[in-house]
């Protein structure tokens, strides 16, 4: 009877240990120190016009200026080529470009490449980039 209880106790300890290890392995670490999010939207009409915007936020008391750089890119000749670039800078901790429209050609893949820069005054604290793939435009 004592051996049975000891085996049960050991089994419970092993299960609890596995649960603790699993829980600690599932902790999500932040990708950036200051930047919280990068957002964008890209839609292409049947007539071949890309409508897009990009933005992001860095909600930290250390951040007082944010700059967003949005590149519309086309996959051509086995590489991403930038068709146009838009930039917006804002005081505070968030920035967003206005909605832009740009003509694109059928038969290529497109994406937005968005970079967000967080500043304290003129000192760059952090820069992060995020691609958003639209896919192939027939």
Can you annotate each of these PLM segments?
Residues 2-25:
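Sec-dependent N-terminal signal peptides of Gram-positive bacterial secreted proteins and lipoproteins
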Residues 24-138:
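Low-complexity, Ser/Thr/Pro-rich intrinsically disordered linker/stalk segments at domain junctions
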